[in-house]
Amino acid sequence: MTPTIITDVKAFAIKPDRHNLVVVKVETNKGVSGLGCATFQFRPLAVKTVVDEYLRPLLLGRDANQIEDLWQVMNVNSYWRNGPITNNAISGVDMALWDIKGQLADMPLYQLLGGKARTAIPAYTHAVADNLEDLYQEIDRFLAEGYRYIRCQLGFYGGNPSQLQTPDQPIAGSYFDQTDYMDTTLKMFAAIQERYGNQFQMLHDVHERLHPNQAIQFAKAAEPFNLFFLEDILPPDQNKWLQQLRSQSATPIATGELFNNPMEWQELVKNQQIDFMRAHVSQIGGITPALKLAHFCDAMGIRIAWHTPSDISPVGLAVNNHLNIHLHNAAIQETIAIPANTQSVFGGSPQPENGYFYPIEKSGIGITFDEAAAAEFPVVYRPHEWTQSRTPDGTLITP
């Protein structure tokens, strides 16, 4: 096979709608270019800098066909590795290289990886409201659209300090009463189960805001509600507690969206302490490491549910789609409606149909990127207050 020489590497940091997105474009001497998702919405310009200033000169003139070797070169080039900024930058290039290979082969990515493991992948979406009646309306809408898996959240991750017993002159920010949250959420599960029966299966995301003993209590109390999974019940630096949780609760546990380093998942997978791996593909370095992680999980009976939030580009969403169609142990695909401006920048964004994502049949990843349209949406700094929730006494919660 003749070499496919990399002639340019570009990173684009944009904010077409609510979230900052980062996309990488790799160009070659064969006139074929590829796209990759490098979105780390909290540090978009840092990722762009790594791509433009460090990876670009490293990659120019190299053979785009040699994806494994190029991934290894990028991973060790800075010596220190496995951090979110570098991993996302590497991911953008890695996905783009797979996109190029698929186009050169005239094959969709899932076919390039080995073909279908299923006809379509079930999807789940998010029903979020401040009260039960509004939440029911959200659920009814999603049921009408064909969803049979719905993540249910009552309120967001925080609260109003004026409604909590806080010290005088509380620190400004988002507040979160862990005991009240557990009580309110369990009552929500019961109300939804009574109203809807088995019309759909609930999921729920704790977003790492409980202490270990609270997490065990909550998972045990959630057992009667037959959740598809309970997500991120602990922060990753407390995941050793999952061994105790697993021994005391049958509630399926999913975690992984904060993972960057293989050391964060190796023991969890080897010891079968989780049911679902929720890694974010760009956060772990792209398609190349995602395939290795998925196969490791498959050998240990752990299913895949890639993190697919609203702060992911349609390129990243499409990659998850391809992986989920191909991987034997893929279980479900998260999805949130893609806003209008984002759709104007990215062509071919995958959309669920009656609760499923079907294979993308275009060659490569199958997404287009309008650079002129993207230029209309420059990146904007956001403080992301929701990552800085506090307990009523003002203590910062570590997500």
Curated annotation (Swiss-Prot):
Keywords: Magnesium, Metal-binding. Signal peptide: none annotated. Mg(2+) binds at D205, E231, E257. The keyword Magnesium applies. It comes from the Bacteria. GO terms for molecular function: magnesium ion binding. Gene3D superfamilies: Enolase-like C-terminal domain (3.20.20.120), Enolase-like, N-terminal domain (3.30.390.10). D-arabinonate binds at H207, E257, R278, H307, E334. InterPro entries: DgoD-like, Enolase-like_C_sf, Enolase-like_N, Enolase_C-like, Mandel_Rmase/mucon_lact_enz_CS, Mandelate_racemase_C, Mandelate_racemase_N_dom. PROSITE patterns: MR_MLE_1. GO terms for biological process: amino acid catabolic process. The keyword Lyase does not apply. Belongs to the mandelate racemase/muconate lactonizing enzyme family. GalD subfamily. Has no detectable activity with D-mannonate and with a panel of 70 other acid sugars (in vitro), in spite of the conservation of the residues that are expected to be important for catalytic activity and cofactor binding. May have evolved a divergent function. This is D-galactonate dehydratase family member ECAG_02205.
